[in-house]
Amino acid sequence: MRGLKNYIMTFEPPIHWNDYEDIAMKLYERFGDEFNEGKIYRVRFTDLHKWVMEIPKFEGKPEESNEGHLEMIQSTWVYEWRDNQK
């Protein structure tokens, strides 16, 4: 039972392109305050796409990405950054 409890407590479901909040939290964990609001909005989508693909447990396929997903990830990352400035 102990093993199952540890597994349940550490299980993280896979992340996909529409999991904007999960992706934003992972990006903030990776970059922290290195990227402020202005820098986040200036990130090239090609770089953002690459960084999302590098997130552990990310199971989205590159071809499933689109500009709408990347815009939502970018704006959600800004909100995550703002929340951590308090």
Task: Give a label for each model feature.
Residues M1-Y7:
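N-terminal amphipathic/basic-hydrophobic helices that include classical n-h-c signal peptides
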Residues Y7-K86:
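A charge-rich, low-complexity, intrinsically flexible signal that marks solvent-exposed coils, linkers
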